Amino acid sequence: MTTRGKTSFILAGAAVLFLALAPGSPAQENSHRGDFAFMTTASEEMPLSDGHVLMRVVQSGMIFADDPASPIDRTATTCSGSTVMEASARATVISGHCDGVDADGDVWTIWYAGDQDGGDWGYMGGTGKFEGIKGGGTFSAEAQWSDGRGINAWEGTYTLR
């Protein structure tokens, strides 16, 4: 093999190695929406000095995305949060966090904040396929039953690494 041939071979090999080690294409932002159907599994109330009530709740349920390709579709989800309620029972402040576990055992986590009508949420992180997830969106309360069941609608964006 000539010197020129060896040089071309080495450069071609280096190019293949560079491409193999280069990070993948830039992550793409995707949209998704759906519902969170839940049941309140724990709740406690604490009267506050100004007549408001602090309610701490744990809710468990399932995420149903409108598009089955959404990575969080059909994830078992648990949320823990606090709600400040007026004497009229109107929720003025709602905040907390949720974690979802998919069929593969990968976990995503979000924060949320709003009032009884809805609010904002955002991804905090995750494991496995959700490691490095970014994004967020909005939610709204759709239905609440007196036995602790409910449905919240959500929409937002996500970017996976």
Regions found by a protein language model. Name each.
Residues 2, 24-25:
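Glycine-centered signal
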